[in-house]
């Protein structure tokens, strides 16, 4: 099936409702034999390295398995307060600079930073700055970590669609990352402001933020845009867990102009792991 036919078929599906239904299923406490069989089948299908995570019998639901932690010590964090560490395990989709207020999604497709962040004033802070888009496949570890230490100053929740974010969709659906539901975490770091955008996708029913349990889960029916700026920012450390996808998706990092420089070897398709250096001070 070619890309356009695939996307045309997806247009007919109630993607948000489907994602809520799948999300509910992943939170179902199925009988242990059923649960273990499902997890093992999923791991075989996608090539998940089960040696990196706790034993399967500790997970009460399939969703807990999907957002599984890693065994301690498997993802060392690149040292240096001005070194940007990868927040996720995944593949580079795009990197570049925000030019004319826009980010590149794929060859011949771009989209506005203001639409992505749901906040024009916030987007203006990143005009001309570096960005990186990282795609998490189903096999990947799905927790998100802080790329730098500093303080969380606020967040933005932007409701939207739940298109897939696989390569076929990225090549075909214009403005995909500004269409899908997303949670934007805003940081002040040794490299200035940084935004960590967690973009939802089909069957990615929820994105949770560990730094503030009061933030509502995403993919709620009838949800409205929300924002919050903390009177007392929340201190965080580089490599600390930021949150998790309860199925896979995409993370986009944005930096202030003149503050961060990304490694030029981060070409589309390059694999990265949590804690690996992505760049540093400009």
UniProtKB/Swiss-Prot annotation:
Pathway: Phospholipid metabolism; phosphatidylethanolamine biosynthesis; phosphatidylethanolamine from CDP-diacylglycerol: step 2/2. The gene is psd. It is a peripheral membrane protein. PANTHER family: PHOSPHATIDYLSERINE DECARBOXYLASE (PTHR10067), PHOSPHATIDYLSERINE DECARBOXYLASE PROENZYME, MITOCHONDRIAL (PTHR10067:SF6). Its main location: membrane. Its cofactor is pyruvate. It catalyses: a 1,2-diacyl-sn-glycero-3-phospho-L-serine + H(+) = a 1,2-diacyl-sn-glycero-3-phosphoethanolamine + CO2. Heterodimer of a large membrane-associated beta subunit and a small pyruvoyl-containing alpha subunit. Catalyzes the formation of phosphatidylethanolamine (PtdEtn) from phosphatidylserine (PtdSer). Is synthesized initially as an inactive proenzyme. Formation of the active enzyme involves a self-maturation process in which the active site pyruvoyl group is generated from an internal serine residue via an autocatalytic post-translational modification. Two non-identical subunits are generated from the proenzyme in this reaction, and the pyruvate is formed at the N-terminus of the alpha chain, which is derived from the carboxyl end of the proenzyme. One of its GO terms (molecular function) is phosphatidylserine decarboxylase activity. The modification Pyruvic acid (Ser) is found at residue 249. It comes from Anaeromyxobacter sp. (strain K). Keywords: Cell membrane, Decarboxylase, Lipid biosynthesis, Lipid metabolism, Lyase, Membrane, Phospholipid biosynthesis, Phospholipid metabolism, Pyruvate, Zymogen. It comes from the Bacteria. NCBIfam families: PS_decarb (TIGR00163). Its EC number is 4.1.1.65. This is Phosphatidylserine decarboxylase proenzyme.
């Amino acid at each position: 099936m070619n890309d356009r036919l695939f996307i045309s078929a997806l247009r007919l599906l109630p993607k948000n409702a489907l994602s809520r239904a799948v999300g509910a299923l992943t939170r179902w406490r199925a009988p242990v034999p059923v649960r273990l069989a499902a997890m093992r089948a999923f791991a075989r299908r996608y090539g998940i390295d089960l040696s990196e995570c706790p034993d399967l019998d500790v997970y009460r639901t399939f969703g807990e398995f999907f957002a599984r932690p890693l065994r301690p010590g498997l993802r060392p964090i690149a040292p240096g307060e001005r070194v940007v560490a990868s927040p996720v395990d995944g593949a580079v989709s795009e990197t570049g600079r925000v030019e004319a207020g826009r980010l590149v999604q794929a060859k011949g497709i771009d989209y506005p930073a203001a639409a992505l962040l749901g906040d024009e004033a916030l987007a203006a802070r990143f005009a001309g700055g570096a960005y990186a888009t990282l795609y998490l496949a189903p096999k990947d570890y799905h927790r998100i970590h802080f790329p730098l230490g500093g303080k969380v100053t606020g967040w933005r929740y932007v409701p939207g669609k739940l298109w897939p974010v696989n390569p076929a969709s990225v090549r075909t659906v214009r403005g995909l990352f500004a269409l899908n539901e997303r949670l934007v975490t805003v940081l002040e770091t040794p490299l200035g402001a940084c935004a960590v955008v967690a973009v939802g996708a089909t069957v990615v029913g929820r994105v949770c933020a560990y730094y503030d349990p009061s933030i509502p889960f995403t993919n709620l029916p009838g949800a409205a845009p929300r924002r919050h700026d903390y009177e007392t920012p929340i201190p965080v450390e580089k490599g600390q867990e930021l949150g998790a996808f309860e199925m896979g998706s995409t993370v986009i990092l944005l930096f202030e102009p003149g503050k961060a420089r990304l490694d030029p070897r981060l070409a589309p398709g390059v694999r990265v792991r949590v804690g690996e250096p992505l760049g540093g001070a400009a």
